[in-house]
């Protein structure tokens, strides 16, 4: 089933396996797809003499991973091909104790402290770019905590199950039969959600750890990586404290405007940032969520969930921005159940259906063009009296027969039963007339909101909560610098963020040698 060239590459990946790995396969011999499923598993087993297969008879195809005869808690219902192929390879490597995605001791301790038996099911689409991160993070948790299991489910094979659960977006994670998470996520986010859902013993058992540095960079995107590297090159002790390396870059598919790099992907750029960071003596603490800060003293304090505290005389805030929501009543109820932010991931659920795209910038029009290829009808709603997208995109969308564009239109309400979206209410801003549009789904593309909540009560921010910086990236507080999309710098671009991060680091170093901090 797998191409010979791919199998050769996989052989190289598994060349260092030391544990005995068993793929325990359950299959229905009467299923017409049984031979294809079995062929896939046998192909994987053929890549290493450390991997073998065993077969059991059952209703549905699935297989679990055993290490030295013991269950790891990781299983797959469906063939983990497409974007999930990496999830399978990493699951086997991680089972053997290998892989750069394995967390540090502090995060592992939190995973081990989760309470009770935790049975996870992660519903995915094999074309979803956000799904592998979630599957891989939950697989790691299963390996660390024997009370956790995670089953990847190919939603395309189990449509009845998808409809019964009213899943309209992927990845969708269920814990012990109840919804836990929908959409993009990483180890840190998922761990926090599980701690809130099932409880944890960690807070009572945790040892409070204080880590001291010369410079602490908050955020691991282009601005944060640049700032950390520039600071480390000055011989300073530097730490990055971030939810994930790469930041929002991870959610970008194609990147063609990073000067000197003709074309790359967000995932690749995030990996390249980590590789570059690792070239220097920079301590990376990812999967961390900042819960409190004290930035007004000479020695700044940053506390993260899990009991760690970081202190330094200089802080660079490079926490980036997140997708802006509509800010409408009941919006939380419909996210993942009709309201979405990723057309690539969730668009396939709306094949042959009617959807709307809110936002007429480049992201919104690109989303409309993508969705037009699979949806019956796409309605684009732009708040302003003109679209802001590039002319070439406007021309393209105008040529599509199943796309309709409305300007000067404000979305005022989400309509539905609280579980499933059925439409939206919009207002024509030229005459204040309202009307309802029946829809199956809506994709929100209205820009970004700065991730400044942990700092906005201490440093000066704009009414939009962007951190105000001067030309040298200094904020209103001595020893506190900021860079990238979280700030007032115009034009939120990767190239600009990298330059801003470098400026912030150089300003911090300049203040240090002049005795300002």
Annotate each predicted stretch with a short phrase.
Residues 204-212, 319-374, 468-471:
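Glycine-rich dinucleotide-binding loop and its adjacent helix/turn
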Residues 3-42, 111-146, 152:
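Local sequence-structure signature of Cys/Sec-based thiol-disulfide redox active-site neighborhoods
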Residues 322, 327, 333-349, 438, ...:
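FAD-site-proximal beta/loop scaffold in flavoenzymes
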Residues 115, 121-126, 130-132, 136-138, ...:
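Beta1-alpha1 glycine-rich phosphate/pyrophosphate-binding loop at the start
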Residues 55-74, 159-176:
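Structural micro-motif
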Residues 49-58, 146-160:
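Thiol-based oxidoreductase modules, predominantly thioredoxin-like and allied folds used
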Residues 67-99, 174-202:
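Non-catalytic, surface beta->alpha helical segment in thiol-disulfide oxidoreductase systems
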Residues 270-305, 309-312, 317, 372-471, ...:
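A Rossmann-like FAD-binding core segment of flavoenzymes
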């Amino acid at each position: 089933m797998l191409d010979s060239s791919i199998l050769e590459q996989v052989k190289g990946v598994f060349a260092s396996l030391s544990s005995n790995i068993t793929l325990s396969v359950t299959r229905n011999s009467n299923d017409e797809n049984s031979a294809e499923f079995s062929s896939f598993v046998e192909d994987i087993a053929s890549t290493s003499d450390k991997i073998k297969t065993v077969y059991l008879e059952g209703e549905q195809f699935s297989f679990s991973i055993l290490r030295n005869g013991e269950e790891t808690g990781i299983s797959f219902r469906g063939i983990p091909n497409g974007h999930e192929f990496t999830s399978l390879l990493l699951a086997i490597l991680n089972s053997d104790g290998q892989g750069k995605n394995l967390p540090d001791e502090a995060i592992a301790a939190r995973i081990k402290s989760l309470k009770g038996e935790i049975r996870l099911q992660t519903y995915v689409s094999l074309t979803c770019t956000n799904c592998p991160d979630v599957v891989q993070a939950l697989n790691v948790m299963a390996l660390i905590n024997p009370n956790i299991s995670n089953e990847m489910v190919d939603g395309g094979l189990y449509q009845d199950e998808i409809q019964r659960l009213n899943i309209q977006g992927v990845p969708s994670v269920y814990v012990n039969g109840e919804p836990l998470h929908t959409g993009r996520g990483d180890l840190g986010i998922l761990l926090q959600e599980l701690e809130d859902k099932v409880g944890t013993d960690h807070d009572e058992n945790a040892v409070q750890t204080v880590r001291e540095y010369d410079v602490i960079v908050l955020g691991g995107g282009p601005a944060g990586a640049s700032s950390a590297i520039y600071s480390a090159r000055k011989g300073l002790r530097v730490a990055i404290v971030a939810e994930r390396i790469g930041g929002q870059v991870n959610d970008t598919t194609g990147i063609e405007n990073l000067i000197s790099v003709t074309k790359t992907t967000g995932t690749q750029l995030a990996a390249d940032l980590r590789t570059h960071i690792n070239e220097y003596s920079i301590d990376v603490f990812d999967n961390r969520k900042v819960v409190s800060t004290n930035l007004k003293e000479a020695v700044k304090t940053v506390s993260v969930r899990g009991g760690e505290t970081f202190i330094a005389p200089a802080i660079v805030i490079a926490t980036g921005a997140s997708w802006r929501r509509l800010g409408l009543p009941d919006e939380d109820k419909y996210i993942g159940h009709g309201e979405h932010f990723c057309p690539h991931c969730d668009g396939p659920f709306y094949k042959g259906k009617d959807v709307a795209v809110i936002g007429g910038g480049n992201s919104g029009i690109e989303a409309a063009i993508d969705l037009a290829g699979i949806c019956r009808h796409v309605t684009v709603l732009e708040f302003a009296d003109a679209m802001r997208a590039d002319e070439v995109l406007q021309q393209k969308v105008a040529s599509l027969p199943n796309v309709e564009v409305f300007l000067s239109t404000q979305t005022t309400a989400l309509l539905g039963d609280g579980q499933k979206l059925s439409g939206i209410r919009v207002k024509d801003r030229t005459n204040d007339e309202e009307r309802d549009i029946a829809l199956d789904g809506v994709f929100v593309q209205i820009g970004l909101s700065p991730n400044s909540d942990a700092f906005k009560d201490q440093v000066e921010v704009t009414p939009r909560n962007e951190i105000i910086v001067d030309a040298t990236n200094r904020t209103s507080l001595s020893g506190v610098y900021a860079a990238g999309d979280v700030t007032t710098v115009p034009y939120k671009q990767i190239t600009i963020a990298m330059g801003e991060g470098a400026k912030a680091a150089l300003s911090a170093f300049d203040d240090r040698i002049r005795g300002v901090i």
